Amino acid sequence: MTKFIAAAVQMDSQDDKMANLAAAEGYIREAAARGARLVVLPESMNYIGRDMAQEAEAIPGGPTFQRLSGLARELDLWLEAGSIYESNQEDPARPFNTTFLIRPDG
């Protein structure tokens, strides 16, 4: 029987997106070092704060997707991004709460 290791990350995201992404990267790298083939991040993993609409980003293409996609490719693992605020072109004041799954090829 083939062994499959999945990791669930719990983290305390705040209103500093870059700090949250750096923390998430550390947890992802730790999980990969322990043999995880799937890493699942929590809801609102990259930002929790008042400026949700301002911090919303395009998927794919935004900084969170780009960083996580690169990590999935580098570490050869599946990465479920919990959720992030995605830009809503029809109503920019109301971003979507979106999750996405990244394959090992990024």
What are the language-model segments listed below?
Residues 17, 26-104:
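Cys-nucleophile CN-hydrolase/nitrilase-fold catalytic domain and related Cys-dependent amidase chemistry
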Residues 2, 9, 46-50:
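A generic structural signal for ordered alpha-helices
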Residues 23:
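PLP-dependent aminotransferase-class I/II
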Residues 3-15, 40, 98:
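Active-site-proximal beta-strand elements of phosphoester/diester hydrolases
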